[in-house]
Amino acid sequence: MAKIQLNGKKVVIKSNFSLFDLLKKYKLVNKKVAIEHNGKIIQKINFKNKLLKNNDKIEIVHFIGGG
């Protein structure tokens, strides 16, 4: 288990949890999102490879249309 900070809230996740797993957990896989991992923007192609560790800080922004 690991404790991370997700959009300012403390969250406990399983070991070997990737950014993609986090998106699945919050039902954001098919949404347009930007993810910041410890202050760096992560490209979508790296979501499955980027494993989360204890004390990581994650910010997820998803875009919604409107008019």
Over which residues does each language-model region extend?
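Short, basic/aromatic beta-hairpin or loop at an interaction surface
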Residues: 27-38
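Short amphipathic, charge-patterned alpha-helical segments
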Residues: 18-27
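Loop/turn positions that initiate beta-strands
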Residues: 55-58
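Eukaryote-biased recognition of intrinsically disordered, low-complexity regulatory segments
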Residues: 1-9
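Short acidic beta-strand-loop surface patches of small beta-rich interaction domains
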Residues: 36-49
